[in-house]
Design a protein with these regions (language model features):
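Phosphate-coordinating loops and pocket residues in cytosolic domains that bind phosphorylated ligands
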Residues: 34, 63-64
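A short, Lys/Arg-rich alpha-helix, primarily the initiator
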Residues: 1-15
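DNA major-groove recognition helix of helix-turn-helix/homeodomain DNA-binding modules
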Residues: 26, 45-60
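DNA major-groove recognition helix of helix-turn-helix
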Residues: 35-36, 54
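Helix-turn-helix DNA-binding elements, focusing on the entry/boundary residues of the two helices
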Residues: 7, 18, 29, 44-47
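Short alpha-helical DNA-recognition segment
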Residues: 15-34
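The alpha-helix within a helix-turn-helix
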Residues: 11, 22, 51
Length: 65
């Protein structure tokens, strides 16, 4: 499972909408949708923040299964 799938699972497990998640990370509205649809991925520094927020290791967030 790659970033887009794992990110969506983590976001939904917290009961967060895409818009709310954009706000949590200070992103432009629609950014989470772009990630979850696989059009792009966040920069490495932001991936670290996302992993910390969701309480997972970076490896678990970005690695393909």
């Amino acid at each position: 499972m790659g970033f887009k799938t794992r990110f969506r699972e983590l976001r939904e497990s917290r009961g967060l909408s895409q818009a709310a998640t954009d706000e949590v990370f200070g992103l432009m509205r629609g950014t989470c949708s772009i990630w979850e649809n696989g059009f792009s991925e966040p920069e490495e520094e932001l991936i670290e923040d996302i992993a910390r927020f969701f309480g997972v290791r970076i490896h678990d967030l970005v690695e393909e299964a």
